[in-house]
Amino acid sequence: EAEQKRQIMEVLKTGDVIGIVSPSHVAVKNDYDIFRKGLENLGLRVKYADNLFHRDELGFTASLEDRVSDFNSIIHDPEVRMVLFGGGLGAVDIVPYIDYDGIKADPKYFLSYSDGTSILNAIYANTGIPAFYGQSPGEFGNVSEYDKMQFVSNFLEGNVHEFKKNSEWTTINAGKCTGRLIGGYSVNFALTLGSRFYPYSMDDDYILLIEECDMFQSVRSFSTYLNAISQNKIMDKV
């Protein structure tokens, strides 16, 4: 079923619309206008969600209502072919309110990383439609040649099953395996794995991807999250 849904999503074409939302942080318009220009330079159009630049009374993110409204409005927008969002904190807040039936009715590309992986995993687990770990809006402000190449190759040329190595990556134990890729930011995945919005079938095999940044977590904290993940029954299928 997931592969059938994948086939429905055509590669992006010149003039296609990227919808930008911000479920995890306060978006600053001056910055996002720069990110927007980077996407437009690739021949794409950009649509900001209505409440993208709002913030709540604490100044941390837009309100939950605004973030849910933005995300579901972008889902229902037939013109939008990719939904792009960044990281921060708070993406998991909107997971119970996402219109998963709306996503299944009109499959789009969902692209994010870090805190946004809470949403990527929920979309895949509840719809069977692949979501994509990759660039956030900020990468397009001064996009590197590698990020540009990967984005164009994956989404404008359709080479989503090909990965070209970045020289900064290091392989510790080489090998080959097959399975469905799950995972994401370590603390998010550890805290949400097994909840009702993250149901994983024990009939599938999985490849586990874990993201961490030493700016935000200590080795001790990362070890705690990794051990919590390793004690989940899903690891029998990894």
Question: What are these model-predicted stretches?
Answer:
Residues 82-92, 113:
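N-terminal glycine-rich "phosphate-gripper" loop used for MgATP/nucleotide binding
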